[in-house]
């Protein structure tokens, strides 16, 4: 077997993000890899991830309201604080070898931490309309995968040229 990897996954907000991430996490665990999640304890991932037997590194973030652009300032401040919290958690627990983002704003601090620290990350877009977080993080992704072929166009010119259609995991 290949080297066992330490994998950290960010997926949050809705079951549409979390359930595909949990399915992949279970497969990775079955193959001998160590898997943890980043998420919010007060959101759905705060219940589903521990119930599935995976550790959850807690962070607190929120999206912003595009009709009220000033909310982006508060959102950015929360992302920066969350990125710092992740840095401290990884200093204590060991940094991941690779990370995965399954969409939602909860992935942004993790994937920004990865970019800054040279840790490769992958994206998966399972929705019919790619979300803002995945679009923002695509430029530095090692690879992006999509559930639907039409979603590939959202990643054109961003990051790795060989994005793939995988369907939902």
Predicted regions and their residues:
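Glycosyltransferases and closely related glycan-assembly transferases
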Residues: 85-100, 106-122, 135-143
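Short amphipathic alpha-helix
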Residues: 17-28
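Active-site-proximal region of nucleotide-activated glycan assembly enzymes
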Residues: 44, 55, 115-169
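Glycine/Thr-rich phosphate-binding loops of Rossmann-like dinucleotide-binding domains
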Residues: 17-18, 45, 108-109, 154
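Conserved nucleotide-sugar phosphate-binding/catalytic loop shared by glycosyltransferases and other
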Residues: 4-12, 31-81, 85, 161-169
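Residue-level detector of alpha-helix initiation sites
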Residues: 14-15, 19, 104-106, 128-132
């Amino acid at each position: 077997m290949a080297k066992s990897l330490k994998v950290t996954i960010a997926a949050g907000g809705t079951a549409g993000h979390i359930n595909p991430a949990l399915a992949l996490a279970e497969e990775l665990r079955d193959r001998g890899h160590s898997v943890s999640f980043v998420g919010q304890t007060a959101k759905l991932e705060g219940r589903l991830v521990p119930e599935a037997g995976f550790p959850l590194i807690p962070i607190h973030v929120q999206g912003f309201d595009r009709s009220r652009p000033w909310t982006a300032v508060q959102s950015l401040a929360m992302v920066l604080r969350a990125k710092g919290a992740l840095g401290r958690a990884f200093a204590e627990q060991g940094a991941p070898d690779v990370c995965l983002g399954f969409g939602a704003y909860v992935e942004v601090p993790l994937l920004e931490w990865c970019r800054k620290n040279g840790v490769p990350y992958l994206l998966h877009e399972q929705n019919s309309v790619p979300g803002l977080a995945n679009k923002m993080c695509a430029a530095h992704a090692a690879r992006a995968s999509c559930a639907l072929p039409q979603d590939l166009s959202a990643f054109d010119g961003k990051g790795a040229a060989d994005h793939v259609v995988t369907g939902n995991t």
